[in-house]
């Protein structure tokens, strides 16, 4: 076995917790865990710990929850742990230059894309949104830029025609820990080979918004079907009927030309709700009216057929 490293782990959501879990089984010494402060969640707005905090406390690890790492006293928390390396996975706080330089081997990050493609906040969703054939994880050495550091290790996986951001997230949550453990071994052995990112290949994965997820019928059916998968499970593609938002969970493309204006309902039957787009027909298969559970088009038509009269246009 390689040298056992003293590791600080910094992360917040379930995706990060899966990486911490792998680290704890790897023989390395996790000396401290940084995660975001508890946040109000649920209907009662009760303060809830992050998945990383829950796991760290279960395992008896010291947990730190600073609001920022800019204050000197919070940076001292990192320095006092005398770590060999800091592993950062979906932490959500900026690491100042002073913190990046504290561990002997620096700070490394698990990023959910094949860098330099999709630097930024929403790499999983944007890879689907753009119609990429594959994605993966990149383990990189962190610097002060946004996902600009040297790449240490990559693992890729295909994006299938059925993938949603939810299923891709799960795939990358399996790949990430594998890549992380391999990278740590290479760092410990001195065999890591940093690779500079090619700036000519950079794309940016901008944050998603609920407004962006509103269905724009002027786009092609193929684009819309992809966006529906990219925005599932958040923020969810949606359309508005009688001033109510209706989420769309699943749709398919019917490769038939139509002269109808985009947004025109062509048919509504047990096969789905067929709507004209800027190019081709989108068949809505699973929808969720406000305050209800997701249901098949057939079930929605049974209760709300007046919403989907052929010839009418959806906004």
Swiss-Prot record:
Family to which this protein belongs: Belongs to the Fmt family.
Record EC number: 2.1.2.9
Chain sites annotated for binding (6S)-5,6,7,8-tetrahydrofolate: 113-116
Gene3D superfamilies on file: Formyl transferase, C-terminal domain (3.10.25.10), Formyl transferase, N-terminal domain (3.40.50.170)
NCBIfam families per record: fmt
UniProt xrefs under HAMAP family: Formyl_trans
Top-rank taxon, per record: Bacteria
Species assigned in the record: Shigella boydii serotype 4 (strain Sb227)
Catalysed reactions, as listed in the record: L-methionyl-tRNA(fMet) + (6R)-10-formyltetrahydrofolate = N-formyl-L-methionyl-tRNA(fMet) + (6S)-5,6,7,8-tetrahydrofolate + H(+)
Role description: Attaches a formyl group to the free amino group of methionyl-tRNA(fMet). The formyl group appears to play a dual role in the initiator identity of N-formylmethionyl-tRNA by promoting its recognition by IF2 and preventing the misappropriation of this tRNA by the elongation apparatus.
Protein biosynthesis found in the keyword field: yes
UniProt entry tagged with the keyword Transferase: yes
SUPFAM superfamilies assigned: FMT C-terminal domain-like, Formyltransferase
Annotated Pfam families: Formyl_trans_C, Formyl_trans_N
GO function terms (MF aspect): methionyl-tRNA formyltransferase activity
Gene that specifies this protein: fmt
Name under which the protein is recorded: Methionyl-tRNA formyltransferase
EC primary class: transferase
């Amino acid at each position: 076995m390689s040298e056992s490293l003293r590791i600080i782990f910094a992360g917040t959501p379930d995706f990060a917790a899966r990486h911490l879990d792998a680290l704890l089984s790897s023989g390395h010494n996790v000396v401290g865990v940084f995660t975001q402060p508890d946040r109000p969640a649920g209907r009662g707005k009760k303060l809830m710990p992050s998945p990383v905090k829950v796991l760290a406390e279960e395992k008896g690890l010291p947990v730190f929850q600073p609001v920022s790492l800019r204050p000197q006293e919070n940076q001292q928390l990192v320095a006092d742990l005398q770590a060999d390396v800091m592993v950062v996975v979906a932490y959500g706080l900026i690491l100042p230059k002073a913190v990046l330089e504290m561990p002997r081997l620096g700070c490394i990050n698990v990023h959910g894309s094949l860098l330099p493609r999709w630097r930024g906040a929403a790499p999983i969703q944007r890879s689907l949104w753009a119609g990429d054939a594959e994605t993966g994880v990149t383990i990189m050495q962190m610097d002060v830029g946004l996902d600009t550091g040297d790449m240490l290790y990559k693992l890729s996986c295909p994006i299938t025609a059925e993938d949603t951001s939810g299923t891709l997230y799960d795939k990358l949550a399996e790949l990430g820990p594998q890549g992380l453990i391999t990278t740590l071994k290479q760092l410990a052995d001195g065999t890591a080979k940093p690779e500079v990112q090619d700036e000519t290949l950079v794309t940016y994965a901008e944050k998603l918004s609920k407004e962006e997820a509103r269905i724009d019928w002027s786009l092609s059916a193929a684009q819309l079907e992809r966006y529906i998968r990219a925005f599932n499970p958040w923020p969810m593609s949606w359309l508005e009927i009688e001033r109510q938002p209706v989420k769309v969970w699943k749709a398919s493309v019917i490769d038939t030309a139509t002269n109808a204006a985009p947004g025109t309902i062509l048919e509504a039957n047990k096969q789905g709700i067929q709507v004209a787009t800027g190019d081709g027909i989108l068949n809505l298969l699973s929808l969720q009216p406000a305050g209800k559970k997701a249901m098949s088009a057939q079930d929605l038509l049974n209760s709300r057929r007046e919403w989907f009269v052929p010839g009418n246009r959806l906004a």
